[in-house]
Design a protein with these regions (language model features):
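Anionic, Ser/Thr-rich low-complexity intrinsically disordered regions
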Residues: 1-146
Length: 146
């Protein structure tokens, strides 16, 4: 049981590291896009979701679509399971179309000086051993120790 818990904890940490990498890449996309543009007018309406974050959501949807499509063809699955996944696949493809359209519209608005976005730093805490209570040791006086 203890080995299983340790393995589970290692998996969680690996997932956290990959999520941090995804967040870092989304920020880099936004930074590179902003660097490719002339300065954006601060008086323009601000779009709260950045292109990088939309692209990140599209990548997650792509994975869901891939794996859901596999489930529609899995011969060892029940007919009901395959049907449920066909229905899910329709929804996921619809969501991908909506999101891709929103990204295209946002980018067109940015390029036409109708909207702007800012680089938002995610500042995730879960991988920082000085900020995540699971990763730091709490002393008897409850002060976190890095």
């Amino acid at each position: 049981m203890q080995r299983l818990e340790k393995s589970k904890d290692n998996c969680k940490r690996a997932i956290d590291k990959l999520n941090q990498l995804r967040n870092d890449l989304a920020e880099r996309v936004d930074r590179d896009l902003l660097d490719s543009l002339p300065p954006l007018d601060p008086a323009l309406p601000l779009h709260s979701e950045t292109p990088g974050l939309i692209i990140d959501r599209l990548s997650i949807l792509a994975l869901k679509i891939f794996h859901t499509a596999e489930e529609t063809r899995r011969s060892s699955a029940t007919h009901e399971h395959r049907e449920r996944n066909r229905e899910r696949l329709v929804i996921l493809n619809d969501q991908r179309g909506d999101l891709a359209g929103c990204l295209a519209e946002l980018w067109a608005d940015i390029r036409a000086n109708r909207r702007r976005f800012k680089l938002y730093r995610q500042l995730k805490m879960y991988n920082d051993p000085t900020l995540n209570p699971v990763l730091y040791t709490v002393s008897s006086d409850s002060d976190p120790k890095p």
